[in-house]
Amino acid sequence: MRALALDVGLKRIGVALCIDKKIALPLDAVLRKNRNQAANEIKNLLKIHEISLLIVGIPKGGSSEEEMTRRIKHFVSLLEFDKEICFVDESGTSKEALGYGVANTRKKDGKLDSLSAFIMIKDYFAL
């Protein structure tokens, strides 16, 4: 069983992979130029890695929770993923990811986003 976790943002999408509920690792983030380009890149990952479970972070709390949840669910619908999708609370994952010692948080390369996705998948499977 393979799972993919997504930390969907407006500029970047953090991505992490879990294999057989034992091994989890962050992948390169997808830099969003537009929705369709980003959706196509994620679709490709879903296919290449033969994903059977998609874990998607939803921000809980905060003033923009409702709007971000709507945007994230719309993006997920563009993936046309016909297997299991699980939405999880991503609150605090970025802060926790900083504890992993990302070398340069000013550099917007998506490493922090993919570490957030890694934390979501790690928590989901209690790794």
Curated annotation (Swiss-Prot):
Q: Which GO terms describe its biological process?
A: rRNA 5'-end processing
InterPro entries to which the protein is assigned, alphabetical: RNaseH-like_sf, YqgF, YqgF/RNaseH-like_dom, YqgF/RNaseH-like_dom_sf
Q: Which keywords, in A-to-Z order, does the entry hold?
A: Cytoplasm, Hydrolase, Nuclease, Ribosome biogenesis
Q: What SMART domains does the database record attribute to this sequence? A: YqgFc
Q: What do the Gene Ontology cellular component annotations say? A: cytosol
Which EC class heads this enzyme's classification? hydrolase
One protein family per Pfam: RuvX
Judging by the UniProt lineage, the source's domain of life is Bacteria
The set of disulfide-linked cysteines is: none
Cell location: Cytoplasm
Q: What is its EC number?
A: 3.1.-.-
Single GO term (MF): nuclease activity
Q: Which HAMAP family match?
A: Nuclease_YqgF (MF_00651)
Q: Which family does it belong to?
A: Belongs to the YqgF nuclease family.
State the protein's purpose.
Could be a nuclease involved in processing of the 5'-end of pre-16S rRNA.
Q: What is this protein called?
A: Putative pre-16S rRNA nuclease
